[in-house]
Amino acid sequence: MNRRDFIKNTAIASAASVAGLSVPSSMLGAQEEDWKWDKAVCRFCGTGCGIMIARKDGKIVATKGDPAAPVNRGLNCIKGYFNAKIMYGEDRLVMPLLRMNEKGEFDKKGKFQQVSWQRAFDEMEKQFKKAYNELGVTGIGIFGSGQYTIQEGYAALKLAKAGFRTNNIDPNARHCMASAVVGFMQTFGVDEPSGCYDDIELTDTIITWGANMAEMHPILWSRVSDRKLSNLDKVKVVNLSTFSNRTSNIADIEIIFKPNTDLAIWNYIAREIVYNHPEAMDMKFIKDHCVFATGYADIGYGMRNNPNHPKFKESEKDTVEKENVITLDDEEATSLSYLGVKAGDKFEMKHQGVADKNWEISFEEFKKGLAPYTLEYTAKVAKGDDNESLEDFKKKLQELANLYIEKNRKVVSFWTMGFNQHTRGSWVNEQAYMVHFLLGKQAKPGSGAFSLTGQPSACGTAREVGTFSHRLPADMVVANPKHREISEKIWKVPAKTINPKPGSPYLNIMRDLEDGKIKFAWVQVNNPWQNTANANHWIAAAREMDNFIVVSDCYPGISAKVADLILPSAMIYEKWGAYGNAERRTQHWKQQVLPVGAAMSDTWQILEFAKRFKLKEVWKEQKVDNKLTLPSVLEEAKAMGYSEDDTLFDVLFANKEAKSFNPNDAIAKGFDNTDVKGDERKIQGSDGKEFAGYGFFVQKYLWEEYRKFGLGHGHDLADFDTYHKVRGLRWPVVNGKETQWRFNTKFDYYAKKAAPNSDFAFYGDFNKMLTNGDLIAPKDEKEHSIKNKAKIFFRPFMKAPERPSKEYPFWLATGRVLEHWHSGTMTMRVPELYRAVPEALCYMSEKDGEKLGLNQGDLVWVESRRGKVKARVDMRGRNKPPVGLVYVPWFDENVYINKVTLDATCPLSKQTDFKKCAVKIYKA
């Protein structure tokens, strides 16, 4: 057998084992011939691996890596090989479920009973309109997802913002990528990375910051490993983390730092460059393409600013008080010394409402801000492992700085949740660009700061589509009148339809439910009651008698269990869709099989719900708050040819343009399309009649309308058919050509267009009008343009609002593991993955275990000021925390760790810090 056949047969055997099949080696070829294969995308992380799917007799029977996919080149991680099995768990949701009493009436305290789609939508409509009519456009909320397909997210966004006129839609990507978004927008004026995965094969140095790539992005890590092992002497790998993990296995340097001190380490590197190695600075790059900037430090921590809120327990209040004022210790006072403060001072958070404000400063001011971050200070502040000597830690910091500084060395900095889930997450994202810009090592092949996405379409859907509470597609925002006008024209809705006031971010939707400001919430493609910090509050809020919770899901996770109505959703290969990955690569797939039971796609659910609303119910005058009332746009609608009795479905989704998309399009030949044509299941739809399809190619319509937003200004996407012929394209796609490196005029059409005689153009236009100031504040109100330039930010080191104490002596960090995805709703139902990791463990150091009298495998309580959970101790596992820190993954609903975590956020991004709170550990 030659190498080619060996690889081929190994792939088939691996795929077959996923589906529970045993295939004799002599039958591999015949078995494959009996399956129908097609290209698709992996359901899991933001890497965006291409896979091949085999279907037979109406089921997905196997998956394997796609050798033609440039991202993964035929490889899959362990989760990727189980894309088939996630679809067929024993408790897959197959019918709508409504809480009812014995009379068949909705009852908040009742038990779940199966109902028809019509009955489900009847109750959903009733409860929505009750909240909407009582509280207005702010009284309802939608928990969206970075796992929406692009079309699903676009439909949800359009229904919410053009239909219901609410901006209370926000994705779980708020939990994973919001700080990265702010970092991009504040620095570049536009979202998403300048580089691409090709940087891995071109770089000399890979530095990971709060990114356990070996487990969280394993296929990318295989490329990093290959690069390292093929060039052992030249290529260097550094892993910076708060605990030792698998990413350190091939690292030349492992740096274990105290939580939050990554801020100090970045400033140390910048200080080394500016003070001790000024020759390393790319002064031409800086002068031509950058300005220096800063913002306020006294911005709070995204907690409630009322420690006496009636829902707080007494034990929570001392942490929440820090939202308004903190007492500075020596280390924090030193970092903030430019503000004239000293240790022991009360530091009031006076600029909570303008956390994102920034202004231009001089290089001299920037240099002044960096002054405290000497090697001595930074090492003392940041050293995270008590077993390591201060001198050894200093040497590592120096080696790290030298790798960045080395003149001809290419450097890629990768990060994920360690940066983003951070009370200063936006700042630390900006700091990464700070160092790369100082050295001129950004937007170049093999060099750049690169934010890795966690979810499969956090980029493609949450960010690019704009399913955030403040956004519209293609980096537009609801607060900008021009952006609203553009959106209204594309959507063919009257002027002033879109609400100009940003809605509640993800965590605030929970808080609004608790406060009675929102009384209806719809969850799609995520599990907010498991994935949101301080969960005891939100469980209680869900069960408030006035609140009605709808959860669209494929399995009964925690969110479904606290809901009032559960809608069964089609899974990934049971529908048409598209995802966008971390390197701006957009990939499409076709529906491979029919959904299980009576499950239907989230797109279908959105469109069917839209049928329940007439224009006169939603486009009337609507009060938002005491300062804003949305005008009635019904007269303008009539002038556009609409009737006040038209439904949102008619206007937004089944309009004349939509109906022009041929349901028998050649691209769909040989494939099911339940949304377009119905299917052999003969599902009884939301009107009680057999659903026979919409009669037009709805997914193609949604795609082609959506791409209009980005054409011509740096967000260009290819047409629908093109993506079904290729293994994805990295946008902007101009004249059929994808873009590898943005902002570089050699590679980026828009950079060349913006600055034809320059090497670079940072052409994003967000927040490119600045005032001048110093480190403390802006000095005048006169704005000037920094067109085509990026910002080099100074941001100070600040500590987390809750830190270990005598009563709660441990740091707690949460995160994922290789074998499971997010809340485990899918992967915990795959027998092989469940057997591999059946429960979430409490990883801790052996020294801490000995001190507490614990043995390997003992059950302990992990308790914070907010709640406690029971977990099994692991002192010898893959994750090795230093003394004083424990790590508990969040995939296991039986180890409900978000009952323990703190709901503090980055005030700029509103992203929760899941990595830092204080706990005590004791034997159960």
Curated annotation (Swiss-Prot):
GO molecular function, one term: nitrate reductase (cytochrome) activity
GO terms, biological process: Mo-molybdopterin cofactor biosynthetic process; nitrate assimilation
Catalysed reactions listed for this entry: 2 Fe(II)-[cytochrome] + nitrate + 2 H(+) = 2 Fe(III)-[cytochrome] + nitrite + H2O
SUPFAM superfamilies: ADC-like, Formate dehydrogenase/DMSO reductase, domains 1-3
Enzyme Commission code: 1.9.6.1
Pfam families (UniProt xref): Molybdop_Fe4S4, Molybdopterin, Molydop_binding
GO terms for cellular component: membrane; nitrate reductase complex; periplasmic space
Signal peptide: 1-30
Cofactor(s) required for function per UniProt: [4Fe-4S] cluster; Mo-bis(molybdopterin guanine dinucleotide)
PTM section of the record: Predicted to be exported by the Tat system. The position of the signal peptide cleavage has not been experimentally proven.
Subcellular location(s) of the protein: Periplasm
Binding-site residues, [4Fe-4S] cluster: C42, C45, C49, C77
Enzyme class label: oxidoreductase
Keyword Protein transport: no
InterPro entries: Asp_de-COase-like_dom_sf, CT_Nitrate-R-NapA-like, MoPterin_dinucl-bd_dom, Mopterin_OxRdtase, Mopterin_OxRdtase_4Fe-4S_dom, MopterinOxRdtase_cofactor_BS, Periplasm_NO3_reductase_lsu, Prok_molybdopt-oxidoreductase
Cofactor binding comment, as recorded: Binds 1 [4Fe-4S] cluster. Binds 1 molybdenum-bis(molybdopterin guanine dinucleotide) (Mo-bis-MGD) cofactor per subunit.
Entry keywords, A to Z: 4Fe-4S, Electron transport, Iron, Iron-sulfur, Metal-binding, Molybdenum, Nitrate assimilation, Oxidoreductase, Periplasm, Signal, Transport
Binding site for Mo-bis(molybdopterin guanine dinucleotide): 79, 147, 172, 176, 209-216, 417, 421, 527, 552-553, 575, 602, 814-823, 898, 915
Domain 4Fe-4S Mo/W bis-MGD-type: 35-91
Residues binding substrate: W890
Listed HAMAP family: Nitrate_reduct_NapA
Record's subunit section: Component of the periplasmic nitrate reductase NapAB complex composed of NapA and NapB.
Chain's role: Catalytic subunit of the periplasmic nitrate reductase complex NapAB. Receives electrons from NapB and catalyzes the reduction of nitrate to nitrite.
Similarity annotation: Belongs to the prokaryotic molybdopterin-containing oxidoreductase family. NasA/NapA/NarB subfamily.
Protein name per its UniProtKB record: Periplasmic nitrate reductase
Source organism: Campylobacter jejuni subsp. jejuni serotype O:6 (strain 81116 / NCTC 11828)
Gene field: napA
